Structure formats: structure tokens, C-alpha cells
């Protein structure tokens, strides 16, 4: 498995890489990718880390699990590969951006353009078996990604954390709110959004307002 991760993360996460659970996790993932169809592609598992260098993290969005349909997942939470129809949650994210910032729907759901600006798009579990949602949960990924969130919180300041839905909101316990900005809302999935828990949260303009107040470059959402 080709693990691709930008070098800026390696000193930050080296301690985790040495832990027994991480070795067991990587062995499990290698076995799964050898014997099953899994997503994202092996060389995209750590795409969030590769596109968004540690020194440049300004915003963190936390997802739960990669998409488990063919050609959807590309290693960035909520994002899909170019040419793939928008899944419902992603469509609702773009609808909120349209309302909040007046930006038209984009032509692609590939969020690499966000990641390259310092938006760290982290799924709690980084891999999944085809058509089996949650199939790689409880194997060590959550322990690893919790450690990533803690390290961002400890080593950086003035990061905006966007916590959408109950699962992501629990991660607030890992974040030092005295030096970071946490925004919470319902999940953008139709189940939540259509009940009034997503639309109108204005997280995208609020994020940019905060970044501007700290003298940081705003995100082109």
C-alpha cells in the first residue's frame, strides 16, 4: 500500500506511527485491500494530510466514514472525485454556501481546492469496504484520527473546527476551545438538514470572518 503523506505531518505524528495499535491497523488495512475492494484507492488514504500541510491548517472539518460506492471517495471527507454526482450531504453543503456566500453550485464535488487552501478534511475512519458502510470502524483509525485532532489543538492556534452532527460534535472534547474557534451545527445529510438543523448555519461566512479577524487569508469556498 502506497502511503502518501506530506512530510510536515511526520514529526507531529511519528509517536503514533510507532505504537502497536497503528502497526496492527496498517496490517489490517493491507490485508483488506489485498483481499477485498476498498475505498479510497490505497494512494489516497492519506490525501487529507497530503493536500493540507500541517503548517497550513486553518480549518478542520470532521467526517465519519469514506463513501463506499465506486469511484466516490478520494480521501477527503465529504469530497468526491471529479465527474461523480454530488452525494446528498455534499449537495447540501454547496446549497448552504450558495445561500451564505452567494456562490453558485460548483461543477465538481472534488474538495481538493479547499484542502489546498488549508481546510483539513478528516474522516474519523480513513478506509471502508465497498458497499459496507462502517466496515473498517473500530480497527484503530478512530484512535489515530483522535490523536491527529489533539495534536492540531495542542500545536496550533486560531484553527476553526467545523463540527457537523452528533458524531463530530463529540470531538469537541479533544479541542482546546480557549485558543481555537469551534462551530457546531446539525449534519448536512437530508435527514438532519430537512429538519432544520443544517441550513442557515452560516458556517462558511463565520469561518472567514474569524480568519479575517486573526489576519489570516480567508477560504475561497
Swiss-Prot record:
Function (record text): Excises uracil residues from the DNA which can arise as a result of misincorporation of dUMP residues by DNA polymerase or due to deamination of cytosine.
Taxonomic lineage: Bacteria, Pseudomonadati, Bacteroidota, Flavobacteriia, Flavobacteriales
Top-rank taxon, per record: Bacteria
Swiss-Prot/TrEMBL keywords: Cytoplasm, DNA damage, DNA repair, Hydrolase
Primary location recorded for the protein, binned into one broad class: cytoplasm
Protein name: Uracil-DNA glycosylase
Gene3D superfamilies on file: Uracil-DNA glycosylase-like domain (3.40.470.10)
Catalytic activity of the protein: Hydrolyzes single-stranded DNA or mismatched double-stranded DNA and polynucleotides, releasing free uracil
